[in-house]
Structure formats: structure tokens, C-alpha cells
């Protein structure tokens, strides 16, 4: 009986610790080079009120692929990356827009609703290969332009930032 009580107490203690960590919104620390920093209205962080990610921590969120044409490449191209809605859910983003900044200081503002409505991704790979900085990488916001006619216009092309380095949720 004492052994059973002790085991139940251990299970309760472990459950409490795990639940407390989930409520705290503490994300795992990246071990590699940080590629992306999220800030602003986010609940889950790992770096002084921000959420930082390396390649491995982004890939752990789950990757998807789609083929589409775009103004930047000839023919259909396969992009592989993290669904942006999944990334926003993971960090507990709340707000109406995301201010995206690229390595070259290009900025664009994207409605948060785009990510769910259009299944936009944060691409890490093009045609199965990691994107290099000189090839619009390492991170590129891509919409499945061929899936809906409304995505084939300058509004969505301008939201498709490449060399993405940070996102501020407002």
C-alpha cells in the first residue's frame, strides 16, 4: 500500500512539473545557428520574451511541401517548409498582423489570417534542397499561388518575403 501511494505521488509530481512547464510557455532552446526570431504578442518564448529557432527546431514542427509557379522561378517549383499557421499556434501568437523583416531589411506586413486562409509556409527547401542566402534562403514565405487565382497578384507577391530573419506579431 505504501509503495502504491508513493508511486501515485511521483506520478502526480511529474504531472505537476510538466503542466507547469507547459503553462509557463517555455520553448526548447535551439542548439544550432538561430535563423528566425519571433517577437511581439507571443505567449511561448525561449529567449528573453522572444522565440528563436534554428533549422532543427523549425523542422520539428512538421514540414509540408507543395508545387507552384511563381514570378521568381521558371516552371513549377517544389517548396518545403513549416505551415505558418502552425508556427503561430506554437508560439501562441495573438494579434492581427505580422511584420516580417528580411536579412536585407526589406519589410512587409502580412495579416495573420493569411496563414490559415491560404496555407502559406515558411519554406526552408526548394526542390528538395535547403535554400542558401543567395538563393532567397534560408527562409522564404511562400503561398501556394496556383491553388487560388486571387493569390496571383502583387499583393501576395509582396508578402512573400525571402531571406526572412524576424517576425513581430502585432
Indicate residue ranges for each PLM-predicted region.
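N-terminal intrinsically disordered, low-complexity segments enriched in P/E/S/T
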Residues: 3, 25-170
Amino acid at each position: 500500500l505504501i509503495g502504491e501511494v508513493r508511486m501515485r505521488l511521483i506520478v502526480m509530481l511529474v504531472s505537476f512539473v510538466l503542466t507547469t512547464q507547459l503553462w509557463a510557455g517555455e520553448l526548447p532552446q535551439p542548439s544550432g545557428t538561430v535563423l528566425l526570431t519571433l517577437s511581439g504578442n507571443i505567449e511561448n518564448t525561449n529567449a528573453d520574451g522572444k522565440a528563436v529557432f534554428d533549422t532543427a527546431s523549425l523542422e520539428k514542427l512538421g514540414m509540408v511541401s507543395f508545387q507552384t509557379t511563381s514570378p521568381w522561378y521558371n516552371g513549377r517549383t517544389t517548396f518545403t517548409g513549416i505551415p505558418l499557421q502552425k508556427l503561430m499556434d506554437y508560439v501562441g501568437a495573438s494579434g492581427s498582423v505580422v511584420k516580417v523583416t528580411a536579412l536585407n531589411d526589406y519589410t512587409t506586413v502580412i495579416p495573420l489570417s493569411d496563414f490559415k486562409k491560404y496555407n502559406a509556409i515558411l519554406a526552408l527547401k526548394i526542390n528538395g534542397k535547403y535554400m542558401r542566402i543567395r538563393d532567397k534562403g534560408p527562409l522564404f514565405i511562400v503561398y501556394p499561388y496556383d491553388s487560388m487565382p486571387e493569390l496571383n497578384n502583387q499583393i501576395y507577391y509582396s508578402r512573400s518575403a525571402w531571406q526572412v530573419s524576424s517576425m513581430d506579431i502585432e
